[in-house]
């Protein structure tokens, strides 16, 4: 039997890829990779681009950002330079994504020269420095105001209470501090060094930005960026279009690329086939981003790194480092990819052939033209005949030809003004080559004596030639012997960076600090992510069984909160094991944070008012505004109903709401009290303006050393009753978080809200800090969770108190920052002793299971609520709900207390009450927001929701807890429409 052998490895290598299994495996792998890319793209941020883009432009933006963002090209509207505008939006988002951000907040970022309305509408934590340098900037601000108004009118609830964060100062003058910054096409007027100085003024260490870029700017006087359809051109002044005609070779030979002319050279950017506004900038500023590498200023060294250059846009980053920088050679290069197919040709720039200039010509065109010129050259022919031959070949290589009815571009078109001079230069170059070759041949073929004489006489000939060129410059045309110039495809820059910044930068300590800070923020972020995941994965809770009826027993309110007698007020408090030094450090840190917070609130108020004043045409010299103030203030009035203008005649632009009194105003003199004869502007922050005083006073106080005790009790556990029983006028003072709580405690204690005794012993924390007050040994604090820990410490320090006994519910609404950009870390109370009270005497019996059910749905898994024990109230069923079609169907009963989650719903109820001619006391005292009603107790309460648009407050356990625990007898929830995630509406039917 015959046998045969074969090499299995060779067969697999040659035929393996043709097998069905191999093809199927490749298809499966390709499908998985495509699916992963698609899923990644779907998870990316959705970016909607309304500009109409053609196919080529769409590919440009998808290639650059399609892998990072889920791009939706809506093709809705034609816009000037549409691709540039679309790229600008993606560049802004890309630069912001470079910096740290969490699900809770984004670290504050500065935007030098950016569009503040873009950040405002998207909710970015960004402060824009948008100076009004001219009419163009003011036009842009006016358009942004209109855009903001347009969006807010369509969805006012989303922007309720939100203010745009920007100023009209230059980047170097603004005082807002942030570690990070962006500059989207904002560095043209500042230059590299200007950006570095602005970063230094803001304490910024990293900046990421973009700008239009074309390497040919270093060589040419004009050029074209094809992707952006942008033509750039250097001009010598803002009012002259004369081009910069300096020899390009001289520019390349200069290592520093000095100015083209002694005067200022500008560069203009024009968009082709678009009769829109162009941009003109100082060429030196733009050039600095290409030539400069480092800059040392005010103890910091800044270095620029060019990251990505695509579609005519360069993305760069500038990083600032402190301390000493030892000597180091920094090298970078700028590439000219468009130069590789070109050669420089010197052509006459004047009729006397004294001035010459260099033009670019396609290498293939010059090579073929010169080849034919060399072959056809004949010194016996008339020069005109040779010139015509060269022009004919040059024309055929740089014109449009028609073949079989189809037009084709041969080579590249030559400038009409240079066409004849290029041909003439090629003729001179050809003739010069033949003459040089002839001299070389004659020298090679000459006798020995002639060669010796030529070599000996050469120094004399060179000397006399130099003298003639100096004395008679017009006799130089024959000396132009180098017609061809080799164009480099790149240019390099070498710079030695060395800076003595004093003390060395301790990178290790900085790394430890950043790591600790990031762990704290990451922990909070992880908790929020876990909470959101629990909401998505929560299994529907089974219906709560009815609670067995509790036999009513009389309860002595004096024993509430576990306080049997006055002497045993803190028997159940557990002492904490923290050292006194650690306690003082914590309190001092909290006080510093609170003072910084109040200062930022004051600075923000001044900045907002200054921005409005400048937008309306005011300045810091004259007490006057321009004629467009109505448009400006109508736009701001749609966001803040307390924005207004006071005229010198005493008239207001808008009627002042009843009960509102402005304590300060703003004009060219700044923020402060104003006279009736002055022109000034106001907003909601001018009603009570005490942030600067609180900052100054808190900063001057030392951290207290006394003991802080906390009674953490549920709603209705008798906290106010306990305060009444413990209060001793000789040693105590009662402190509340707000004026409404102070009035409630005064009435409960003294049966009066304005008597001398009531106002002396029950005061708000702000009142104690801002006014004179006697020293006491003990402070009783009501609703302490509404106070910043630093403010509580400041109150104790000013009163010289040795003990603070604080009452509150840690699960209810806590102190929250009014400035989203402020990094709040130490606002939560850190007590030395704690005690819990989990029995409610106010809430009916069905409230506790309702609260437990809401906690199950809203709080992270494993988190328990204090509302675990039953209620001591005799009322068993109190909670109901019903749907209403509109505010007109909400029953306004003077015997009921009405609460809302938002100020907008509160305003609607007040308007409805006025339409029904209800007493003023009703809509003034008995219609409040949930936040305002914390600490209030009423018999009958109605919660009203008039909109079904997204509102996160209905998902927050703390707000819903306050809402359902204000009543003693009945609670009714009236709502318009279905709201997804409405915690109260979802839980009431299950109780």
UniProtKB/Swiss-Prot annotation:
Residue spans making up a coiled coil are none
**Where is it localised?**
Host endoplasmic reticulum membrane
| Cross-referenced InterPro entries | (+)RNA_virus_helicase_core_dom, 1a_necrotic_phenotyp-det_dom, Alphavirus-like_MT_dom, CMV_1a_C, P-loop_NTPase
Please name the source species: Cucumber mosaic virus (strain Q) (CMV)
Q: Write the protein's name.
A: Replication protein 1a
Catalytic activity, EC: 3.6.4.-, 2.1.1.-
Q: Where is the (+)RNA virus helicase C-terminal domain?
A: 838-991
Gene Ontology MF terms: ATP binding; helicase activity; hydrolase activity, acting on acid anhydrides; mRNA methyltransferase activity; RNA binding
Q: Which GO terms describe its cellular component?
A: host cell endoplasmic reticulum membrane; membrane
Keyword Signal applies: no
Q: Which keywords, in A-to-Z order, does the entry hold?
A: ATP-binding, Helicase, Host endoplasmic reticulum, Host membrane, Hydrolase, Membrane, Methyltransferase, Nucleotide-binding, Transferase
Disulfide bonds, which pairs? none
User: Which regions span the lipid bilayer?
Assistant: none
Q: Set out the biological process GO terms recorded for this chain's protein.
A: methylation; mRNA modification; RNA processing
* Stretches the record annotates as ATP-dependent helicase: 711-973
Residues forming the Alphavirus-like MT domain are 72-290
Where do the (+)RNA virus helicase ATP-binding domain residues begin and end? 686-837
Which residue stretches belong to region Methyltransferase? 52-409
Cited Pfam families: CMV_1a (PF12467), CMV_1a_C (PF12503), Viral_helicase1 (PF01443), Vmethyltransf (PF01660)
Question: Topology relative to the membrane, per the entry?
Answer: Peripheral membrane protein
Similarity comment: Belongs to the bromoviridae replication protein 1a family.
Q: What's this protein's function? A: Involved in the virus replication. Contains a helicase domain and a methyltransferase domain. The methyltransferase domain is probably involved in viral RNA capping. Involved in the formation of ER membrane spherular invaginations in which RNA replication complexes form.
Positions bound to ATP: 713-720
Assembly notes: Interacts with RNA-directed RNA polymerase 2a.
């Amino acid at each position: 039997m015959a046998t045969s052998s074969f090499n299995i490895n060779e067969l697999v290598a040659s035929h393996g890829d043709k097998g069905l299994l191999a093809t199927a495996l490749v298809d499966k792998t390709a499908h998985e990779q495509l699916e992963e890319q698609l899923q990644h793209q779907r998870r990316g941020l959705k970016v909607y681009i309304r500009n109409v883009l053609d196919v080529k432009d769409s590919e440009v933006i998808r290639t650059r950002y399609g892998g990072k963002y889920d791009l939706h090209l809506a093709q809705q509207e034609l816009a000037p330079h549409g691709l540039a505008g679309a790229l600008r939006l993606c560049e802004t988002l890309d630069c912001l994504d470079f910096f740290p951000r969490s699900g809770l907040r984004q670290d504050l970022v500065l935007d030098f020269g950016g569009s503040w309305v873009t950040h405002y509408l998207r909710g970015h934590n960004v402060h824009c420095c948008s100076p009004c340098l001219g009419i163009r900037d003011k036009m842009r601000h006016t358009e942004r105001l209109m855009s903001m108004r347009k969006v807010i009118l369509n969805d006012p609830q989303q922007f309720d209470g939100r203010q745009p964060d920007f100023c009209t100062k230059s980047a170097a003058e603004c005082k807002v501090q942030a570690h990070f910054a962006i500059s989207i096409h904002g560095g043209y007027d500042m230059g590299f060094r200007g950006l570095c100085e602005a970063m230094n003024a803001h304490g910024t260490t990293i900046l990421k930005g973009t700008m239009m870029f074309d390497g040919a700017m270093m060589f040419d006087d004009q050029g074209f960026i094809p992707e952006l359809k942008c033509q750039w051109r250097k001009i010598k002044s803002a009012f002259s279009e004369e081009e910069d005609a300096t020899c390009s070779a001289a520019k390349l030979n200069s290592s520093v690329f000095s100015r083209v002319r002694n005067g200022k050279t500008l560069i203009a950017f024009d968009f082709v086939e678009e009769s829109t506004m162009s941009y003109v900038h100082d060429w030196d500023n733009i050039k600095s981003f290409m030539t400069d590498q480092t800059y040392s200023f005010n103890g910091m060294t800044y270095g620029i790194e060019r990251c990505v250059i695509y579609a005519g846009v360069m993305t760069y980053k500038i990083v600032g480092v402190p301390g000493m920088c030892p000597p180091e050679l920094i090298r970078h290069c700028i590439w000219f990819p468009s130069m590789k197919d070109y050669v420089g040709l010197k052509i006459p720039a004047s009729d006397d052939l004294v001035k010459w200039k260099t033009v670019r010509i396609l290498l293939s065109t010059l090579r073929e033209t010169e080849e034919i010129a060399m072959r056809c050259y004949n010194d016996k022919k008339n020069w005109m005949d040779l010139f015509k031959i060269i022009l004919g070949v040059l024309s055929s290589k740089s014109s449009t030809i028609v073949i079989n009815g189809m037009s084709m571009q041969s080579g590249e078109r030559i400038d009409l003004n240079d066409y004849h001079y290029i041909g003439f230069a090629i003729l001179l170059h050809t003739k010069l080559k033949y003459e040089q070759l002839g001299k070389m041949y004659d020298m090679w073929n000459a006798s020995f004596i002639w060669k010796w004489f030529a070599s000996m006489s050469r120094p004399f000939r060179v000397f006399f030639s130099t003298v003639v060129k100096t004395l008679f410059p017009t006799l130089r045309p024959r000396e132009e012997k180098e017609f061809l110039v080799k164009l480099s495809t790149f240019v390099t820059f070498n710079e030695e960076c060395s800076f003595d910044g004093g003390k060395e930068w301790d990178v290790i300590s900085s790394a430890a600090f950043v790591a600790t800070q990031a762990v704290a923020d990451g922990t909070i972020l992880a908790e929020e992510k876990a909470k959101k995941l629990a909401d998505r994965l929560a299994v529907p809770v089974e219906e709560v069984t009815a609670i067995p009826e509790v036999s009513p027993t009389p309860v002595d309110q004096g024993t509430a909160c576990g306080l049997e007698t006055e002497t045993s007020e803190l028997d159940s408090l557990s002492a904490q094991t923290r050292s006194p030094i650690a306690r003082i450090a914590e309190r001092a840190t909290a006080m510093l944070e609170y003072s910084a917070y109040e200062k930022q609130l004051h600075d923000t108020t001044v900045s907002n008012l200054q921005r409005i004043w400048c937008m309306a045409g005011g300045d810091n010299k004259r007490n006057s505004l321009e004629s467009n103030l109505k448009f400006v203030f109508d736009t701001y009035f749609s966001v803040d109903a307390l924005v207004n203008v006071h005229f010198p005649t005493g008239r207001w632009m808008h009627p002042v709401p009843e009960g509102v009194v402005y304590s300060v105003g703003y004009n060219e003199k700044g923020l402060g009290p104003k006279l009736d004869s002055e022109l000034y502007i106001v907003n909601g922050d001018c009603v009570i303006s005490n942030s600067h005083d609180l900052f100054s006073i808190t900063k001057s106080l030392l951290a207290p050393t006394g003991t802080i005790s906390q009674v953490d009790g549920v709603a209705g556990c008798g906290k106010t009753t306990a305060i009444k029983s413990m209060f001793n006028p000789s040693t105590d003072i009662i402190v509340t978080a707000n004026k409404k709580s102070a009035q409630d405690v005064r009435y409960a204690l003294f049966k009066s809200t304005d008597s001398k005794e009531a106002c002396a012993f029950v005061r708000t924390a702000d009142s104690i800090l801002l006014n004179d007050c006697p020293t006491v040994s003990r402070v009783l604090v009501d609703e302490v969770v509404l106070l910043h820990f630093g403010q509580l410490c400041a109150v104790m320090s000013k009163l010289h108190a040795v003990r603070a006994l604080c009452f509150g519910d840690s699960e209810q609404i806590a102190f929250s920052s009014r400035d989203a950009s402020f990094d709040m870390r130490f606002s939560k109370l850190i007590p030395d002793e704690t005690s819990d009270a989990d029995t409610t005497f106010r809430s009916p019996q069905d409230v506790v299971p309702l609260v437990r059910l809401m906690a199950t749905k809203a709080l992270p898994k494993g988190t328990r609520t204090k509302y675990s024990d039953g209620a001591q109230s005799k009322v068993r069923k109190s909670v109901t709900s019903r749907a209403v079609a509109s505010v007109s169907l909400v029953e306004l009963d003077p015997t009921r207390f009405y609460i809302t989650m938002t100020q907008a719903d509160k305003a609607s109820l007040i308007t409805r009450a006025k339409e029904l001619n209800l007493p003023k006391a009703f809509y003034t005292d008995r219609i409040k927001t949930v936040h305002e009603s914390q600490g209030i107790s009423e018999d009958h309460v109605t919660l009203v929701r008039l909109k079904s648009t997204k509102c996160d407050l209905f998902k927050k356990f703390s707000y819903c807890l306050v809402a359902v625990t204000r009543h003693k007898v009945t609670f009714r929830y009236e709502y318009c429409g279905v709201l997804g995630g409405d915690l109260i509406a979802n839980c009431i039917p299950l109780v």
